[in-house]
Amino acid sequence: MGATARSLRLALGLLLLGTLPRGADACSCSPVHPQQAFCNADVVIRAKAVSEKEVDSGNDIYGNPIKRIQYEIKQIKMFKGPEKDIEFIYTAPSSAVCGVSLDVGGKKEYLIAGKAEGDGKMHITLCDFIVPWDTLSTTQKKSLNHRYQMGCECKITRCPMIPCYISSPDECLWMDWVTEKSINGHQAKFFACIKRSDGSCAWYRGAAPPKQEFLDIEDP
């Protein structure tokens, strides 16, 4: 093979390499309804971040230190989790690897859902449900106390486009993306998927506890 041909193949190879997706440089998450985020999480708290620092968290398979961001927090209320208050939250150092950035100083309150690490610690990623507390609707805030838990045996199925259907009675169809082009639409803000007496699940709207008539009804 001549030098010109080798150069062309090398240039083509570099061009193709440059067009490949760089999965390691991006964080991708599937949208979930706030109730799903609650049910999937080990810990759900209302808290403020007091301080942050970078810490070592062991080594990778090559012996290189693994860095994480440690947030010292002030827990205001625990909606789900261990008996011991959460004192520290850990996350990756960059959003490219799903790390979360919280405002520190103790002024901004968050709803934080994530995975327990034991001994007053938890881990969070961009795929967890972490939002400023004051952006939640009244219904969402009240649902954190009991309502969301009532539907953790239900399945919320996101509808990406019409037509879409449920495949079993214990599903609720989440339509926000179709109707509002947003995952933070009406159903996310004002509805919870509740399991009823007959084992089926249905959307329930409002901040008040579901009445017995709703739980006993056979059809949505």
Swiss-Prot record:
The lineage of its organism: Eukaryota, Metazoa, Chordata, Craniata, Vertebrata. Keywords: Disulfide bond, Metal-binding, Metalloenzyme inhibitor, Metalloprotease inhibitor, Protease inhibitor, Secreted, Signal, Zinc. The keyword Signal applies. Interacts (via the C-terminal) with MMP2 (via the C-terminal PEX domain); the interaction inhibits the MMP2 activity. It comes from Cavia porcellus. The gene is TIMP2. This is Metalloproteinase inhibitor 2. Zn(2+) binds at C27. The activity of TIMP2 is dependent on the presence of disulfide bonds. Complexes with metalloproteinases (such as collagenases) and irreversibly inactivates them by binding to their catalytic zinc cofactor. Residues 27-30, 95-96 are annotated as: Involved in metalloproteinase-binding. GO terms for cellular component: extracellular matrix; extracellular space. Residues 27-152 form the NTR domain. One of its GO terms (biological process) is response to hormone. Disulfide bonds join C27-C98, C29-C127, C39-C152, C154-C201, C159-C164, C172-C193. It is found in: Secreted. It comes from the Eukaryota. Residues 1-26 form the signal peptide. Belongs to the protease inhibitor I35 (TIMP) family. Predominantly expressed in the lung in alveolar macrophages and epithelial cells. Also found in brain, kidney, intestine, spleen and heart. InterPro entries: Netrin_domain, TIMP, TIMP-like_OB-fold, TIMP_C, TIMP_CS.
